[in-house]
């Protein structure tokens, strides 16, 4: 017998919630419906104290006298007006502060306010349908297209929707129906009255308990009053969470955390309405594989050049310190952090109090594109919605922050599950033993302890040490906030803390590398290029000069494969040169000092240079192309076994990712895209089309360096044996950023390559 595909959402092994103060006197009216006690079960599991009355066992006056916190009226087996009269009467007299029905109550609400209920034109009894909803009221936090089980085939009609009601949920109608959607939920615009036309308590309805929980949180007779009371309750809960031994007395003033939380909820709700920013738009982008490549966050934390891992942070302001630096350039700061040894970089994306945005995250991700062993990117935000996780992933985040203090356990578990489903192991933030227990129980691999009290912003760096014994050995524990100097870190190293987050202190450090080394018990030095000897490229090489150039110590041998140029070689000659270069040994082999360290990040151009300087016993063969088709370039690379491809025309920069070997791209210093990371291994700065011997002004070269302090180049500017040393010396402090020199006409006599000039040029360049 085939296995069943039935998904059972019933609470067979329930985890009952503690008693809920807001639901201390729930009255459930049983309209002789068979599902009443299923509804009762869900209400009780969510912490409600429920009393059940048959509709003919209690009068309206008696019901009013009992002062229920909520009134739930069960499904009505028949929807004729005379059969729902008992259900309508309590609603009309506004006895309950938050009336709610599991199914037919939508019909009752329609009848009560003058609407019409009619057949839907399709048989729906007992069927499951994907539900679309507005995310408010009972649907807060409920995913879209959640499967729900229908009660019957009747529903309120669109044309008779009372003015005082709004549609809160729908399901798709039949393709041949006159309407596109069947109404599945309605809500009173002013009063706290909600109704649905399906079974939240059904085993086939997903997130039914969440809907019940949302309902039981509702207070007050109007939505305005409910919002006020909920905000006060949330602020009180957050304040109470900071005390492990006593309840914090409730106050009317909201905490800073609550203010930020409320502001972000409202802002995200509005953002989700914008075309291109809607949840469906983000999901479509993710399904189209538009999220950038990611790395494993826990593993990156373990790969540190220090005794523990450094977590850096980019933020322009904070609630505790105010404005830090509004002029901070997030992508530039990220490159500094990465090369200084930071393993993750935390990017604040909250705009109001931290002056960040999701665009900061996207720009930072682009700035470290192509870095070898790049740091992981953390989206630091007040995460409360799956939408924010997907938004962060699409912007390039490798991980996200989730704060236990802000989230109920079920929502927290759901957010962790979604984060895992998109390949991101989150950083779970806690501050006390209760929160740590939750994080450990949910299996968090990386737990951060916030040393800062989020209510009064006081810092106690001992908070992390007090909680470390609760953390499983395989879990990485991070100390967050309040770390300013080496003494703050010493105890963490001794106790086995895996990482520390340093924010303002690092951003304000005058010498970042020195500060980090002293803070984390270095030593650590940023990987830099050696200025002693640039690599040498001989271009326009013909057969007779190839072997001589290699034997002289040249590192790169360039052959011109673009048609119509005076140094272009034939296919036969190109094959001959390829064979000679691949067989001829270099006189001296030295290991590059630029080879990437697996525990540190290196700029893309440092990595590009290391690929050209890696330990190898022969020179590398470079094929030079100009404005030829990509197909031709790929074919020649394969036929000639080219080690490197040089694009010397107007070829798109993106081609570099389509060529299976390192690519050099020629630029004029005024061109755009010279410093674009992730494509060409190194840019070649040249004055003209190549081989012209035209001088390239050093001021232009320096200007290119000034625009991008991480750019490294190959210099080709009319060099020759007599001027290569003086030219490089003329670059002053930028000398180290010339990784290679390229010569063509400078080693020729009467249009022919001179073997003596080749030897002289290599000797002069290697003598630097």
UniProtKB/Swiss-Prot annotation:
Give every Glutamine amidotransferase type-1 domain span: 25-225
Q: In which pathway is this protein known to take part?
A: Amino-acid biosynthesis; L-tryptophan biosynthesis; L-tryptophan from chorismate: step 1/5; Amino-acid biosynthesis; L-tryptophan biosynthesis; L-tryptophan from chorismate: step 3/5; Amino-acid biosynthesis; L-tryptophan biosynthesis; L-tryptophan from chorismate: step 4/5
**GO MF annotation, one:** anthranilate synthase activity
The protein's annotated catalytic reaction(s) are: N-(5-phospho-beta-D-ribosyl)anthranilate = 1-(2-carboxyphenylamino)-1-deoxy-D-ribulose 5-phosphate; 1-(2-carboxyphenylamino)-1-deoxy-D-ribulose 5-phosphate + H(+) = (1S,2R)-1-C-(indol-3-yl)glycerol 3-phosphate + CO2 + H2O; chorismate + L-glutamine = anthranilate + pyruvate + L-glutamate + H(+)
Q: Which UniProt keywords apply?
A: Amino-acid biosynthesis, Aromatic amino acid biosynthesis, Decarboxylase, Glutamine amidotransferase, Isomerase, Lyase, Multifunctional enzyme, Tryptophan biosynthesis
- PANTHER family named among the record's database cross-references: INDOLE-3-GLYCEROL-PHOSPHATE SYNTHASE, TRYPTOPHAN BIOSYNTHESIS PROTEIN
Protein name per the record: Multifunctional tryptophan biosynthesis protein
Q: Which gene encodes it?
A: TRP1
């Amino acid at each position: 017998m085939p296995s069943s595909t039935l998904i059972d959402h019933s609470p067979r092994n329930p985890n009952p919630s503690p008693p809920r103060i807001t639901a201390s006197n729930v009255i459930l009216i049983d309209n002789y419906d068979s599902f009443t006690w299923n509804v009762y079960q869900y209400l009780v599991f969510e912490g409600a104290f429920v009393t059940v009355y048959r509709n003919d066992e209690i009068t309206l006056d008696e019901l009013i006298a009992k002062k229920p916190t909520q009134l739930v009226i069960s499904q009505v087996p028949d929807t004729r007006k005379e059969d729902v009269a008992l259900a309508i009467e309590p609603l009309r007299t506004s006895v309950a502060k938050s009336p709610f029905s599991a199914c037919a109550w939508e019909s009752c609400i329609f009848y009560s306010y003058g609407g019409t209920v009619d057949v839907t034109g399709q048989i729906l009894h007992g069927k499951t349908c994907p539900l679309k909803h507005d995310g408010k009221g009972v649907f807060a936090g409920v995913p879209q297209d959640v499967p729900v089980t229908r009660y019957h085939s009747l529903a309120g009609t669109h044309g008779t929707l009372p003015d005082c009601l709004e549609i809160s949920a729908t399901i798709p109608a039949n393709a041949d129906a006159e309407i596109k959607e069947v109404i599945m939920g309605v809500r009173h615009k002013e009063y706290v009255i909600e109704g649905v036309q399906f079974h939240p308590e059904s085993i086939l309805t997903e997130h039914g308990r969440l809907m019940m929980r949302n309902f039981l949180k509702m207070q007050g007779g109007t939505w305005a009053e409910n919002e006020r009371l909920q905000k006060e309750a949330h602020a009180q809960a957050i304040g109470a969470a900071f005390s492990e031994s006593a309840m914090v007395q409730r106050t009317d003033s909201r905490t800073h955390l609550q203010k930020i939380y409320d502001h972000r909820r409202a802002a995200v709700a509005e953002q989700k309405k914008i075309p291109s920013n809607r949840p469906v738009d983000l999901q479509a982008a993710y399904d189209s594989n538009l999220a950038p490549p990611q790395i494993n966050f826990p593993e990156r934390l373990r790969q540190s050049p220090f005794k523990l891992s450094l977590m850096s942070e980019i933020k322009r302001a904070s609630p505790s310190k105010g404005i830090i630096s509004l002029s901070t350039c997030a992508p530039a700061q990220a490159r500094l952090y990465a090369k200084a040894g930071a393993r993750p970089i935390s990017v604040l994306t909250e705009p109001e109090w931290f002056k960040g945005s999701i665009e900061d995250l996207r720009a930072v991700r682009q700035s470290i594109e192509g870095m070898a062993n790049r740091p992981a990117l953390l989206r630091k935000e007040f995460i409360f919605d799956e939408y924010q996780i997907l938004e962060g992933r699409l912007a390039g985040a490798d991980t996200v922050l989730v704060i236990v203090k802000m989230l109920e356990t079920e929502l927290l578990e759901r957010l962790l599950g979604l984060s895992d489903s998109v390949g991101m192991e989150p950083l779970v933030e806690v501050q006390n033993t209760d929160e740590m227990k939750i994080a450990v129980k949910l299996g968090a691999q990386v737990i951060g302890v916030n040393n800062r009290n989020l209510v009064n912003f006081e810092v106690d760096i001992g908070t992390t040490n007090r909680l470390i014994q609760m953390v499983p050995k395989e879990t990485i524990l991070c100390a967050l906030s309040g770390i300013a100097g080496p003494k703050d870190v010493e105890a963490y190293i001794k106790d086995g803390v895996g990482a520390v987050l340093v924010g303002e202190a690092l951003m304000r450090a005058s010498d970042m590398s020195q500060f980090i080394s002293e803070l984390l018990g270095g030593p650590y030095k940023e990987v830099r290029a050696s200025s002693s000897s640039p690599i040498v490229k001989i271009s326009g090489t013909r057969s007779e000069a190839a072997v001589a150039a290699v034997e002289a110590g040249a590192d790169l041998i360039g052959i011109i494969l673009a048609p119509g140029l005076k140094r272009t070689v034939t296919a036969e000659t190109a094959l001959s040169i390829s064979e000679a270069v691949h067989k001829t040994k270099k006189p001296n082999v030295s290991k590059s000092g630029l080879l990437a360290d697996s525990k540190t990040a290196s700029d893309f151009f440092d990595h590009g240079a290391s690929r050209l300087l890696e330990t190898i016993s022969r020179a590398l063969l470079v094929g030079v192309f100009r404005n030829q088709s990509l197909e031709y370039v790929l074919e020649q690379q394969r036929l000639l076994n080219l080690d490197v491809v040089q694009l010397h025309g107007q070829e798109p920069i993106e081609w570099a990712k389509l060529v299976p070997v390192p690519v050099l791209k020629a630029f004029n210093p005024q061109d755009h895209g010279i410093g674009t990371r992730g494509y060409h291994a190194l840019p070649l700065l040249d004055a003209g089309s190549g081989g012209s011997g035209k001088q390239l002004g050093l001021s232009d070269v320096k200007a290119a360096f000034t625009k991008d302090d991480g750019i490294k180049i190959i210099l080709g500017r009319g060099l020759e044996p007599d001027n290569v040393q003086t030219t490089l010396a003329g670059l002053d402090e930028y000398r180290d950023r010339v990784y290679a020199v390229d010569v063509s006409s400078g080693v020729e006599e009467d249009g022919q390559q001179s073997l003596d000039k080749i030897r002289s040029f290599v000797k002069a360049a290697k003598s630097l």
